[in-house]
Amino acid sequence: MKKIKIKFVDFNVGLGFKLEDNEIVNSLSKYYDVEICDDPDYIFYSVFGLDHLKYDCVRIFYTGECYTPDFNECDYAMGYDRLSFGDRYLRLALYRLFRFRKSYEKIINRPPFDMAYVSKKTGFCNFVYSNCFAQSVRARFFDMLSAYKRIESGGRYKNNIGGPVADKLAFQEKTKFTIAFENTSYAGYSTEKIVEAFAAGTVPIYYGDPQISQDFDTNAFVNVHDYRSLEDVIKRVQEIDNNDELYLQMLNTPPIKNPMDTSDLDAFLKNIFDQEYQKAFRRPRSHTSTDMEIFKRRYRLLEKYFFKYTRKVKNTLIRIKKGTLLWS
């Protein structure tokens, strides 16, 4: 079995990412003797830092954030964009990986709901967010829909139940609808928000990827992008809320159009690691790309010793201004 030396850098381990136990490592371990070390031949990196610039080896980028890969810095990438770039790119949404994979698998073959399940719902709609830096449309919709009925807000942002919830899905399950708005709207960018709303047995009210209908059946949720205004979205939600038969029909519509396993990830990684090492490089080695990396490495020092701290203070002040809970 071929031995490969890899390392993960610039990932946000605070969000539950496990360096030695994740879909990437598990996929590679099927075919290779994987060593995670500090002198790698290959690195996997994400958007939470610039440490990847220290490694002049094969670079494989992954993002769970709304960020298009820079193919001048990476040899290969996995992300949200619906694009084709030879063997250098794989579209791999966040909800198919890490701790979110369980919710995705849960809704692939979920049992049908009945009217008794609908009758158990004790709340109208939920809103679970701690990020107050998203596009304003999310907060605006919360306020507009709240004029119709109370929305249970269980995150740190706009919390109205006395504190953040410990179990998000259990909290969501009590309500009929979930406000599943991404931080921003961008073609291809869809995260765990819609998947967790389905997994909790609710009807998502979704905003984010204008092309979401390519991945999920719009008969199973309210797609904000299908309506001319937020007022029209609210009218549709009211219609569903007042028609239990229609609501149950939406609950029982299979949400995922083309359920996917990890075989595409396996094939993508095998193509990279089965090659001779020197032939696996893809990124340009021009004077321009080299100069840009030098510039970013200099910026990295400013980020490490200055900008990181000023941004933290600024963001804390914004959270306080917007009423976001800073602790449980």
Residue ranges and their predicted role:
Residues 2-61, 67-152, 161-180, 187-328:
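Pol beta-like nucleotidyltransferase catalytic core
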